[in-house]
């Protein structure tokens, strides 16, 4: 691939971009990680919490207006321009004809498609369970332990009110208050 390539990822996408940068060291010249789901075990990112949240999250609305209202409420602390972009690119019409402006809409990424990013089976081909739980996710914790292997310049950005930017989280990264 021709450089420069800048990897940009938010939340679990940030974790995946960072992991790719470690496994394919020359792919990115720079990374921008926005509230990346990367952290030590005590932050709880290796548990089923992300998967459970995904399964409870609403993904369909009767109208685009309903979806926009719900997203603006859920992400009310976001910068308005960023929120406008999220709404523009994350909702699509459920109708066959794109000419119809109103009607049912869904998130572009469905809940089960998102879920497979957060959990993986812990049983082997024989069906025998390897761990205590049937599914688990270690990607965010694995990447936390691999942060020292990142070789490209990286902007690691967490919002002031992000759960990934609490005093406890900053302490786990060795960052001063």
From Swiss-Prot:
Class of enzymatic activity (EC top level): hydrolase
Upregulating conditions: Expression is positively regulated by CSN5 during infection.
Compartmental location: Peroxisome
GO annotations of cellular component type: peroxisome
Biological role: Abhydrolase domain-containing protein; part of the gene clusters that mediate the biosynthesis of the host-selective toxins (HSTs) ACT-toxins responsible for brown spot of tangerine disease by the tangerine pathotype which affects tangerines and mandarins. ACT-toxins consist of three moieties, 9,10-epoxy-8-hydroxy-9-methyl-decatrienoic acid (EDA), valine and a polyketide. ACT-toxin I is toxic to both citrus and pear; toxin II the 5''-deoxy derivative of ACT-toxin I, is highly toxic to pear and slightly toxic to citrus.
Molecular functions per Gene Ontology: hydrolase activity
Gene behind this protein: ACTT2-3
Keywords, in A-Z order: Hydrolase, Peroxisome, Virulence
Protein family (similarity comment): Belongs to the AB hydrolase superfamily. AKT2 hydrolase family.
SUPFAM superfamilies in the cross-refs: alpha/beta-Hydrolases (SSF53474)
EC number(s) recorded for this UniProt protein: 3.1.1.-
Major location category of this protein: other
Pathway stated in the Swiss-Prot or TrEMBL entry: Mycotoxin biosynthesis
Keyword Nucleotide-binding carried by entry: no
Name the record gives this protein: Abhydrolase domain-containing protein ACTT2-3
Organism expressing this protein natively: Alternaria alternata (Alternaria rot fungus)
Phylogenetic placement of the source organism: Eukaryota, Fungi, Dikarya, Ascomycota, Pezizomycotina
Effect of inactivating the gene: Abolishes the production of ACT-toxin and impairs the formation of lesions on leaves sprayed with conidia. Does not affect growth rate of cultures, sporulation, and spore germination.
Miscellaneous notes: Gene clusters encoding host-selective toxins (HSTs) are localized on conditionally dispensable chromosomes (CDCs), also called supernumerary chromosomes, where they are present in multiple copies. The CDCs are not essential for saprophytic growth but controls host-selective pathogenicity. Although conventional disruption of ACTT2 could not be accomplished due to the high number of the copies identified in the genome, the high sequence identity among these copies of ACTT2 is likely an advantage for RNA silencing, because it allows knockdown of all copies of this gene simultaneously.
């Amino acid at each position: 691939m021709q450089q420069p390539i800048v990897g940009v990822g938010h939340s679990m996408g940030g974790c995946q971009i960072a992991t790719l940068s470690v496994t394919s060291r020359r792919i990115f010249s720079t990374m921008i990680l926005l509230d990346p789901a990367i952290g030590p075990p005590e932050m709880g990112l290796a548990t089923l919490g992300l998967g459970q949240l995904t399964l409870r999250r609403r993904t369909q609305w009767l109208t685009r207006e309903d979806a926009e209202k719900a997203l603006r409420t859920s992400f009310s602390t976001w910068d308005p321009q960023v929120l406008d972009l999220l709404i523009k690119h994350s909702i699509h019409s459920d109708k066959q004809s794109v000419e119809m402006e109103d009607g049912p809409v869904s998130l572009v990424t469905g809940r089960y498609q998102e879920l497979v990013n957060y959990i993986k089976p812990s049983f082997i081909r024989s069906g025998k369970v390897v761990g205590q739980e049937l599914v688990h996710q270690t990607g965010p914790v694995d990447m936390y332990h691999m942060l020292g292997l990142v070789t490209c310049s990286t902007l690691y950005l967490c919002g002031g009110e992000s759960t990934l930017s609490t005093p406890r989280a900053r302490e786990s990264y060795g960052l001063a208050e």
